[in-house]
Amino acid sequence: MQLSQLFHYPVKSCAGFSLTQASAQLSGLEGDRCWMVADSSGKFITGRQWPRMVLIRPGITPTGLRLEAPDMEPIEVSYQDYLQPQASTVWSYEFQAWRGPTEVDDWLSFFLGTDCRLLYIGQQSQRLLRSDASKPLTFADGYQYLLIGERSLQDL
């Protein structure tokens, strides 16, 4: 198998970007979907509900994450600031994630027009693949890797 393109999505449902190389982990590409926008109860929200999410452009920095969006000042957060445990839910799977500074929550809430917060999966994911509990999973819907063939893409 040969990969023709490789995409990275640091924040679930936000814009992704193309990579030329990546580190493959048991949980997926390193840093992929390790951040998630959630409502006040910790339940994930997606671009299906809030289409403006796809306009948010995340970027990985040496110390954390940078977010950019139209007509907004960029904001950066540090991994080290995510120390507050937060119950979170992706579909029906409940597990612990981490919450950080309210400034980024306010930034996201203002841009999306709804009360929300940014959660981080942490260095050791508490979420495990349902079909194999030895494999960690990030905030991805259910699989660490998603592949699509060129022909299937052309059919879309």
Description of each model-found segment:
Residues 1-156:
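Small-residue-enriched flexible connectors and coil-helix boundary/helix-cap motifs
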